[in-house]
């Protein structure tokens, strides 16, 4: 084959090949393909990082672990709540109609006798052995101070089954007025609250009483000011 024939064949082959796309349309197509490839690579990289550093994926396992840890705690709280409901408790208030004496009453609003505690002979009867919080409050008041000092006492006593004598558990004395005050002070109304509270080991059938020395000075102007109660711990 001559040289001219070979050159001619090459020229014919070049003419038969498709021409490359040119112009603005081809450039936009290439740009879109490049942008899509970049977004695909960026998304795959982000997903890999999230999985690698535990941002997503293990949350379900962590949630299950948290629920497993909370389950014993919830059971403990439920058991504690149930145990609290089963413990002896009492809260009684003074009867304002009982003139000249401190008479405890269980029939009024916000009073409570639960899980074996009884109110007998103006005393709270303990149903079981154990530690108890014992508390009481009284409120004294007067329109004016008398010419002689007034000493107000409030006492919580225990009559135990293990020994016959009555023993004081808590006691307090207050004097709201001082003798020899001026006429202005004597004419001024006064108020004196006394609160007692403490934790004691008690026995079944122990009897507790809360007493005062001057019931005529008790203030019943508002409900809930004079009360007596126990709570098993």
UniProtKB/Swiss-Prot annotation:
Extracellular domain ranges by topology: 58-233
Record lipid sites (N6-myristoyl lysine): 19-20
Cytoplasmic side: 1-34
Site location (Cleavage): 34-35, 39-40, 49-52, 76-77
Keywords: Cell membrane, Cytokine, Disulfide bond, Glycoprotein, Lipoprotein, Membrane, Myristate, Phosphoprotein, Secreted, Signal-anchor, Transmembrane, Transmembrane helix
Cystine pairs: 145-177
GO molecular function: cytokine activity; tumor necrosis factor receptor binding
Pfam entry (one): TNF
Residues carrying a glycan: 80
Main location: membrane
Source organism superkingdom: Eukaryota
InterPro entries in the cross-refs: TNF, TNF_alpha, TNF_CS, TNF_dom, Tumour_necrosis_fac-like_dom
Membrane disposition: Single-pass type II membrane protein
Subunit structure as annotated in this protein's UniProt entry: Homotrimer. Interacts with SPPL2B.
Family listed: Belongs to the tumor necrosis factor family.
Job of this protein: Cytokine that binds to TNFRSF1A/TNFR1 and TNFRSF1B/TNFBR. It is mainly secreted by macrophages and can induce cell death of certain tumor cell lines. It is potent pyrogen causing fever by direct action or by stimulation of interleukin-1 secretion and is implicated in the induction of cachexia, Under certain conditions it can stimulate cell proliferation and induce cell differentiation. Induces insulin resistance in adipocytes via inhibition of insulin-induced IRS1 tyrosine phosphorylation and insulin-induced glucose uptake.
Protein name (database record): Tumor necrosis factor
Gene coding for it: TNF
